[in-house]
Each structure stands twice: as structure tokens, then as C-alpha cells.
């Protein structure tokens, strides 16, 4: 008889392979699967493997024209999620030949494409990916990385300080530049375009770039420090985005910016390549991430988006504060912060890391802390995240009762005091408030900031928490 038999067969007969031993070259994925009632977990896991690789809903004769064993995804392990009814972690291995080299876009189109609308599943979430060394080497990665950035800025041994200019929309270019100048003059390393500042009627991009460049050159001359402003090059087309990046380079600024999720991975990778070739650092904002990553049972965890960004390219990325107004549990956040910064990260389920990840020669990314943070948070931020991070105080700078420059002074004094105390062996977690109070005795700017924000708390539990072990 003919080898082809038409009809529908269960996915698990082909795609559930518990005996499979993963290869070093496989891309491995951990999915949180919530099957529909009556669908066994093995069938659900196999369906995910099939629909995100070579499978379709029925047997087709063209399967015989290729080697399914070589190209199919395999669900090789399933485990129940502790404390959750009808939720499972399904581990899927994908052969490397399924993916185009150097394309995050293609990787995601396969792994998190149509399968997320699959009717046999009530919900599906991609918790983690293991990117093999062979695939990692196909990417340029961050435009420059942590060490090159420090060398360009000549700033070592402490976190970098930033500030998002507010109000985020409505300022004219000249007033915007004035706010930038005041912040940089006061002691910040960077100021930032808000993610939704592109080129609107009240402030066209070219005017903003010019006034911001004037501001940071003036602040550099006055302080003797290298300064920067993240000029947001995000635009409606890739061509327009690159045009803005070219103008930023012509102005001699050190850093540009992109909204990588709304702009898209193809645009982001193009911009990262341009920045590497032309000496620009690249700051990345994650606008839209919570649409994808906030719900615990459906979507994609931010650690996956963070890994994807390191492949696509970016020198900074916003990554949760733990202590501010935006979502972020401590152990989970530190897990993906290490995935951004370190060369090699061991599997550690207590921090949500499902796979050991080796980044080989890919440069690291500086995690950015922003959103509802102020001077009283400085000891915790310094202690939790260490030197290799960017601390960004928007309202926590511009909301100072005396203005932007004193707000910047307050943050710089608080940071220097915390770094000095840490280097002297003091415990920032236990003595943080005392360290800030001591510093405020000789800094009136810090004293005023301490008074304004002494009662501010954002005491809400994180939605996306770790599973019980």
C-alpha cells in the first residue's frame, strides 16, 4: 500500500517523544500549557510542538517529500505546575535548521506564531528559551555592550543616572532642551526622550535633536563629564528611523533610542547594526511589553523578550525596578537581569530560569530601572542591582520643589553616598535610610527631596509571580 494515509491523527503519536535526548544545537522552549477540558497534557504539549514547527491539523502527502524526523519540533518532557490545576510546563526542542540565521523575527514567527490561537489550549505562555551557542553566533547582539559603554563615557564603579523628560508630550523643542540642560548640569549622566516622543506637531524630531544636542554639549562643557540624551529614533518606517539615527550621529551625540516592541525586531536589528558601525550606543524602551508578558498563564515572559533583545541588539533596556510603581518581583527580576548582563547563567528555577544559557561572545546589556523611584529608593536600588545598571528618575528628578538641576543634584548625592557606604562595607539594606539622612545634612537639595517623597509607596503585589517549588 501507499505510505500516505489521509485523515487526522493525534499529535502525540508524532510529536510527543519523552525518550528524546536534546542536542546542543537545539533551541529549547519551556511553555506553560493550560489545555481545554478533556485534552490530555501529552496531546497539548505535542500540539504546541507540532503547530510551532512542521505540523498541521491533518496528514498531508507532502510530508513524504521531506524528513519529518529531522525538522519536527519535539515535546520531550511535561511536568505539572505546583499549586495550579490543569497547568503544565511542556518542554519543546526545535532543530536549528527551522530558523533563519540572525533573525529574531523568524524565530518568534515560528515559536510564538499561530500556536497561541490554538483551540485545544485554553491558554499558552512561553516561559523561557535556551538559545544554543550555534544560533547565538549568528547575531551581532548589542551595539557595543557594558564595557565599551563605560569606556566611551569614562564612568566606572557606580550605576549610571538618568531622567525621562516630563511632561512626556506637549513641550516645545526649546523648552525640552532647557529641561535636558538643567538635569545634565545638575549631575545626571543621561536624559531621555519618553517612549512616545517621536515627531509630533508640537515638537518635530529634528528640532528636538538640535536643542538636545546644544543642551548636552553645554552641560558637558560646564561639568567636565561626558553626558548624553537618548534621542528616540523610532519612526513609522525603517528608512525614516535610520535617517534620524544618521542625524544623531552627525550631531556627535553618544546615544540614540528605539522602542523595540512597537518598532519591531527587524527595525531594531537594523538600527543596532547601524549603531555598531557608527559608534552610537542604543537605549531600548520596552513599550507594549505588559500586553505580552503580564498575565501569568498566557503570552510570553519578559525574560524571553529580554533574551530576544540581547540577540537583536541594544545597550540598555528597561527591566523593572522591584521597588517602584511598575511590575517586577525581586527574584524573577534578578533572574532576567543576569540574563541581560552575564556571559553564562546556570539554570535556576527559584529565579524562573528554566535553562542554562551561554551567551559566548555576545556583549551584555545594561538593565534600566525606572518608574516611580526617588531618593529614598537609592540604597535598595544600589544594593539589589549593583554597579552595572542605569537608574532613571523622571518624576524623582523633575518633581523636586526647587527644579530640575537641584533634583539632579539630590539624586547624584544620594547615589554617591550609597556607593561610598557600600564600598566602606556598610549594609545598604539595613542602614539605607540612615545613609540618606546623613548625606542630606550637607546637601540641602537632597534634604528637600527627602522631605517631598518621604511618604511615597507603591505597595501592590506583583501579578506575575514565581510558582511555588
From Swiss-Prot:
<dbReference type="GO" id="GO:0016984">
    <property type="term" value="F:ribulose-bisphosphate carboxylase activity"/>
</dbReference>
<comment type="function">
    <text>RuBisCO catalyzes two reactions: the carboxylation of D-ribulose 1,5-bisphosphate, the primary event in carbon dioxide fixation, as well as the oxidative fragmentation of the pentose substrate in the photorespiration process. Both reactions occur simultaneously and in competition at the same active site.</text>
</comment>
<feature type="active site" description="Proton acceptor">
    <location>
        <position position="285"/>
    </location>
</feature>
<keyword id="KW-0120">Carbon dioxide fixation</keyword>
<dbReference type="GO" id="GO:0000287">
    <property type="term" value="F:magnesium ion binding"/>
</dbReference>
<dbReference type="Pfam" id="PF02788">
    <property type="entry name" value="RuBisCO_large_N"/>
</dbReference>
<feature type="binding site">
    <location>
        <position position="168"/>
    </location>
    <ligand>
        <name>substrate</name>
    </ligand>
</feature>
<keyword id="KW-0113">Calvin cycle</keyword>
<feature type="binding site">
    <location>
        <position position="370"/>
    </location>
    <ligand>
        <name>substrate</name>
    </ligand>
</feature>
<keyword id="KW-0560">Oxidoreductase</keyword>
<keyword id="KW-0488">Methylation</keyword>
<keyword id="KW-0479">Metal-binding</keyword>
<keyword id="KW-0150">Chloroplast</keyword>
<keyword id="KW-0456">Lyase</keyword>
<keyword id="KW-0503">Monooxygenase</keyword>
<protein>
    <recommendedName>
        <fullName>Ribulose bisphosphate carboxylase large chain</fullName>
        <ecNumber>4.1.1.39</ecNumber>
    </recommendedName>
</protein>
<feature type="site" description="Transition state stabilizer">
    <location>
        <position position="325"/>
    </location>
</feature>
<feature type="binding site" description="via carbamate group">
    <location>
        <position position="192"/>
    </location>
    <ligand>
        <name>Mg(2+)</name>
    </ligand>
</feature>
<keyword id="KW-0934">Plastid</keyword>
<keyword id="KW-0460">Magnesium</keyword>
<dbReference type="GO" id="GO:0009507">
    <property type="term" value="C:chloroplast"/>
</dbReference>
<dbReference type="InterPro" id="IPR017443">
    <property type="entry name" value="RuBisCO_lsu_fd_N"/>
</dbReference>
<dbReference type="InterPro" id="IPR020888">
    <property type="entry name" value="RuBisCO_lsuI"/>
</dbReference>
<keyword id="KW-1015">Disulfide bond</keyword>
<feature type="modified residue" description="N6-carboxylysine">
    <location>
        <position position="192"/>
    </location>
</feature>
<dbReference type="InterPro" id="IPR036376">
    <property type="entry name" value="RuBisCO_lsu_C_sf"/>
</dbReference>
<dbReference type="InterPro" id="IPR033966">
    <property type="entry name" value="RuBisCO"/>
</dbReference>
<feature type="binding site">
    <location>
        <position position="194"/>
    </location>
    <ligand>
        <name>Mg(2+)</name>
    </ligand>
</feature>
<dbReference type="InterPro" id="IPR036422">
    <property type="entry name" value="RuBisCO_lsu_N_sf"/>
</dbReference>
<feature type="binding site">
    <location>
        <position position="164"/>
    </location>
    <ligand>
        <name>substrate</name>
    </ligand>
</feature>
<feature type="binding site">
    <location>
        <position position="195"/>
    </location>
    <ligand>
        <name>Mg(2+)</name>
    </ligand>
</feature>
<feature type="binding site">
    <location>
        <position position="318"/>
    </location>
    <ligand>
        <name>substrate</name>
    </ligand>
</feature>
<dbReference type="InterPro" id="IPR000685">
    <property type="entry name" value="RuBisCO_lsu_C"/>
</dbReference>
<dbReference type="GO" id="GO:0004497">
    <property type="term" value="F:monooxygenase activity"/>
</dbReference>
<dbReference type="InterPro" id="IPR020878">
    <property type="entry name" value="RuBisCo_large_chain_AS"/>
</dbReference>
<keyword id="KW-0601">Photorespiration</keyword>
<keyword id="KW-0602">Photosynthesis</keyword>
<dbReference type="Pfam" id="PF00016">
    <property type="entry name" value="RuBisCO_large"/>
</dbReference>
<dbReference type="GO" id="GO:0009853">
    <property type="term" value="P:photorespiration"/>
</dbReference>
<feature type="active site" description="Proton acceptor">
    <location>
        <position position="166"/>
    </location>
</feature>
<dbReference type="GO" id="GO:0019253">
    <property type="term" value="P:reductive pentose-phosphate cycle"/>
</dbReference>
<comment type="similarity">
    <text>Belongs to the RuBisCO large chain family. Type I subfamily.</text>
</comment>
